[in-house]
Every structure is written in structure tokens, then in C-alpha cells.
């Protein structure tokens, strides 16, 4: 996977945690490969309804490892959740609090929960920690609200999908110094890889599409998004000064 990523010109990877059970493997990989970084968090759809999962102390301990450069992914997802969702709100608040305490930015997921996501980010002081709205699939007003809080917005392979007009509208408007590009692997492989397992190398296809959409050359977009990554995640070590 790493060899294919390197061959595609992808020099750095952030392996995002969706549960603490898998975090150990992510951290081990990040310690072995200097171009791979880790995040620590629990996805809103994981362990649904568990008010104390993860506990404050479990999450606080998880984010302490030096290869962990971010807290998340966290956030709100009402698409597949039903009933009382207070546990999601509490879990999101817990992640924000720890992000502020340790000074590591947030990786935020939001789906069908725009109002509550932005409201909690404002109430809990997420702007103090900073972060990114990852795999963004919502509308421009939501993106603008996050940008106003100092957050970045990350575009995935969804932007290449035929029915993704809303995402393309957002992708055109994100300021260049707040734009990131990602895979969300193993899901959401971009065109021309739809139907296949997504992997880091495919971010090059999304970047190529995004560059054309925004009317810039690929080299410029690749350099800008790489610079943005290291600006957002200052604990990530850049191997070379000018590479991406």
C-alpha cells in the first residue's frame, strides 16, 4: 500500500482512528514508517448508545503517544442512528475537551447533523484546538461556519461522483489555504476506481479532479494541500522541506 502511494506521488499519510481497539495497530505502523501519522478517537457510529465509550481517561491516554497528531475522528452522524442521540453529543464534547487540553487538532465527521455539529463546536470552544471537517459531504453554509471557526475542509473522492453537485460547489469555494484532500480509505474510492477498495494512492486521482475543478494545475494544488496539512498538524514531522 505504501509503495503504491509513493509511486502515485503521495508522500505522507494520516491513519485515522475510528475506535480505540484498532488504535494500537495504527500507532505501531506510525512508529515504523516515518511518513505515516496517527489520530486517536472514536467514530460517532462506533459502539452506538454507549454513554461512556470511550471514557475520558481511555481517550486521554490514547492521545498521549507522540505519533498521534490529532484527536478523532469524532463528530455527529444522524444518518444511521435512531432514538436518543445524547450519547453522541456527549462523546463529541469529550473529544473536543481533550483536544483542547492536549493541543492536538480535531478531525470532525458530520452527516445529517450540521446544526448540532456546528453548535457544539461553538459551545465547546473547538476553535481553540482547530481541526478539519473531514470527508466533507454537506452544504456550503456548514463549510463556511466551520471555516469561520478556523477549521480546514477536506475533500474526498465523493467530489468525483456524478451526483455530488453540492460537494463540488463547496470544493470550488474553499480558500486555498484551508483546503485538504483525502481518501477516507477503504471507502469512497474516486472515479475511475469506484467499486474497488480505496487506498492512499487514489488520493492523486481526487487531487487531479479537484485541481481541474478549481482551475489550478495539479502541482500547485498538491503543494498547497501538503503545506496546509503540516500547518494544521504541527506535530507531524515533514521529511523534506519542499516535497509532497
List the model feature ranges, each with a label.
Residues 1-244:
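Mid-domain alpha/beta scaffold segments of enzyme catalytic cores
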Amino acid at each position: 500500500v505504501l509503495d503504491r502511494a509513493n509511486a502515485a506521488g503521495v508522500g505522507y499519510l494520516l491513519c485515522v482512528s475510528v475506535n480505540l481497539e484498532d488504535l494500537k495497530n495504527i500507532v505501531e505502523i506510525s512508529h515504523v514508517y516515518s511518513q505515516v501519522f496517527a489520530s486517536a478517537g472514536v467514530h460517532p457510529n462506533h459502539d452506538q448508545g454507549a454513554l461512556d465509550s470511550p471514557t475520558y481517561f481511555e481517550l486521554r491516554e490514547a492521545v498521549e503517544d507522540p505519533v498521534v497528531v490529532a484527536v478523532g475522528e469524532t463528530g455527529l452522524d444522524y444518518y444511521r442512528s435512531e432514538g436518543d442521540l445524547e450519547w453522541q453529543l456527549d462523546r463529541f464534547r469529550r473529544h473536543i475537551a481533550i483536544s483542547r487540553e492536549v493541543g492536538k487538532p480535531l478531525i470532525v465527521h458530520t452527516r445529517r447533523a450540521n446544526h448540532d455539529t456546528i453548535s457544539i463546536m461553538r459551545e465547546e470552544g473547538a476553535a481553540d484546538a482547530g481541526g478539519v471537517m473531514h470527508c466533507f459531504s454537506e452544504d456550503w453554509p456548514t463549510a463556511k461556519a466551520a471555516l469561520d471557526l478556523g477549521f480546514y475542509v477536506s475533500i474526498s473522492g465523493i467530489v468525483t461522483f456524478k451526483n455530488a453537485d453540492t460537494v463540488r460547489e463547496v470544493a470550488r469555494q474553499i480558500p486555498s489555504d484551508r483546503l485538504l484532500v483525502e481518501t477516507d480509505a477503504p471507502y469512497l474510492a474516486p472515479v475511475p476506481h469506484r467499486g474497488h477498495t480505496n487506498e492512499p494512492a487514489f488520493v492523486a486521482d481526487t487531487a487531479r479532479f479537484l485541481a481541474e475543478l478549481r482551475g489550478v494545475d495539479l502541482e500547485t494544488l498538491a503543494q498547497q494541500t501538503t503545506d496546509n496539512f503540516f500547518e494544521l498538524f504541527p506535530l507531524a514531522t515533514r521529511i523534506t522541506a519542499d516535497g509532497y
